[in-house]
Amino acid sequence: MNQITTQYITENGACYEQYVITDPAAKTSLTITPERGGMITGFTLDGDEYIWTRRPNFSECNRPRFGVPVLFPSCGNPDGGVHNFEGKAYPMETHGFADLCAWDVESVGPDGVTLALESTPLTKFLYPFDFTLLVNYNLEGNKALISLTVINEGDKPMPFSFGYHPYFVASALENVDFDIKCATCSENAKGEQPAAPEKITLTRKAGADNTIRLLTGVQFPMTFTDKGNGHKVTVDADETFDKGVLWQQDAENFVCMEPWNGWANSVNEEGRHEVLDVDEAMTSEWSITIEKV
C-alpha cells in the first residue's frame, strides 16, 4: 500500500511544502511540489533519481526548466508571443502559465494527490476565460500516473492546448537511445512535415546549444534507455496526446521526452486545438515508468 507524507525543503531562503507518495514494495517514491507549478519534482527507484532538477531555478520566479512542468493553455511559444481571442491580442508566456502558478491541494488519499488551479484576474489578463484545472498524481509500483482535468467554468467556449515537459536525468546525450514510432519528425512544426525515419535520434549540430525533434502521429509509448546510467524511461499517453517533443540543451545532464496535445501556435489556428463548451470538462491521462537495466 502506498504511503503519502509531507516534507519541507528550503531553496535560497524559500520554503516549499512537498507531498511524497511512496511504494515501499517497489522502492519507488514520487515527489510533488504544489507551490512550484503543481508539478512532479522527483521520481526515484531504489533511491536513484530519474527527474532532473536545475538549481537555483527551483526557487526563481521564472518558468521552471526542470521537473515535470504542466503546459496550459498552450505548448511552446505562439506566433508573436500572443493569443488572439475575439479580435484582441493577449500576451502569453512560453508553454502558458500553469507552470508559473502555485496550485492548491484539493485532496490527499488512496487515489493519490490532487491539486487545483483556478482562473484569477491575473490569468484572465493573459487568457480571458474562467477555468478550473485538476491534476492528479498517483504511484503504481514503478509507474507514475498523471491525469489532468480541464473544466470550462465560464459563459463562452474555451480554446486551449496542453502537454507536459518532463526533464529526465541523462548521463550524456550520446548515451541515450530512443524507441519511438511516429508519423513525422522535424525540427520545425511549420509547413509540411517530413516522414519520420525508421530510427528516431536526437543529436546536436556543431556549434548549437540545443537540439529538438517535433513528432506527430506518435504511437505511444515512447521509451529511451541510457547506457551510461542504466536508466530506462517509458512515457505512455492516452488518445488526447498525438504529438511528442524530444529536447536537450547546453549539454546538461537531462533529456526531455514530452507528450503534447498541440503545437506552439495551435490555439490561434482553427481546428488545431481543443474547445470546451460552457460547463464541459475534459480529462487526459499519461504515465511515466522508470526501470533499471
Listing of model-derived features with the role each one plays in the protein:
Residues 1-69, 73-82, 89-92, 218-241, ...:
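Beta-strand-rich N-terminal accessory domains
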Residues 231-293:
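Active-site pocket scaffolds in enzymes
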Residues 21-23, 34, 119-160, 164-166:
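Acidic, contiguous internal or C-terminal segments within carbohydrate-active enzymes
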